[in-house]
Amino acid sequence: MYGQVDEWVGAQKFPGGKTAVQVSGGGMSTSYWGLKGAEDLGNGYKAIFTLEGFFRAQNGQYGRFTGDTTFSRNAYVGIESPYGTVTAGRLTTHLFVSTILFNPFIDSYVFSPMVYHVYLGLGTFPTYSTDQGVTGDSGWNNAVQYQSPNFNGLSASAMYALGNTTQNGAKKWSGQVLYFHGPFAATAVYQYVNFNNSPGDLGSFDSSGVPGLKAQSVAQLGVSYDLKYVKLFGQYMYTHNDQTLTSWHVNTAQGGVSVPFGPGTVMASYAYSRDGGGFDQTRQTAAVGYDYPLSRRTDIYAAYLYDHISNQSSGNTYGVGLRAKF
């Protein structure tokens, strides 16, 4: 068994809302636990499986939110071979991998500006509405994926998620190329989601908040370069949405740095999104934080995030947290 527990204490104010002081989970990373295994089949082949589920340590409940499934992080079986790996089940999407690898706050749903713009940017939230983000979850149900072997740092993968229905709803596909070479890394991702008003992948966030939304295509590029004294991050994303009567697009960019400072790391990131043909909104989000390792598996952190959507009051989030891996 393996996983991590992340808890933070602080205050959060979404754009257009009021400040709430809270003890909550997943400040820097969402808490989860997992099981995995492999069986050697001979001749370079292995049978593999992974089961991973999120939980909320602040109240002892499973899932990221009420209604989330038990193994919403990953749940799959597969075959590894010299020719690549094939897996089937609920799989982490290529876009999520690209999003978290090329921003300094990685997968934080509390302090990462890029995660805000990608996964908290489409729909009606408690205090604001926006049409700029990506539909669906960080994982796809009913999915099949092929991942190539690594060729001198270069790898590619393709995924298709069946809708398990006679209609077009929830059918999705994506492809990704990743490259790692010394201090340099890069990625390119494309994903397409075709659905009937609701993508069916994110429980309480199921509704897109945009009536008549039929399909969405997303392309994202990411790069990073580690200069030792500073690591640079950059991302660009183009999102195209097809609605029943019209369409609109969104341009998103993110730049960030992580700087070693003492035994820990200073992180800073800024993301900007602007849409055309939809709500005609602009969104600017910036964050700064410091992560301090207490041991190889435990760290503490402090961070602040500023979030502004045009024509709404700004949001602010700040807090300190503890993360322990096991």
Task: Label the predicted regions.
Residues 9-17, 55-61, 94-98, 164-168, ...:
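Gram-negative outer-membrane beta-barrel proteins
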Residues 3-9, 51-53, 90, 158-160, ...:
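Transmembrane beta-barrel strands of outer-membrane/channel proteins
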Residues 45-47, 83-87, 153-156, 183-188, ...:
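Repeated loop/turn-to-beta-strand initiation elements of outer-membrane beta-barrel proteins
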Residues 34-36, 76-78, 145-147, 176-178, ...:
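Outer-membrane beta-barrel architecture
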Residues 24-30, 67-70, 137-139, 166-172, ...:
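Transmembrane beta-barrel outer-membrane domains
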Residues 314-326:
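Outer-membrane beta-barrel "beta-signal"
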Residues 174-287:
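Detector for outer-membrane/organellar transmembrane beta-barrel domains
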Residues 1-11, 20-162, 169-171, 178-185:
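Outer membrane beta-barrel
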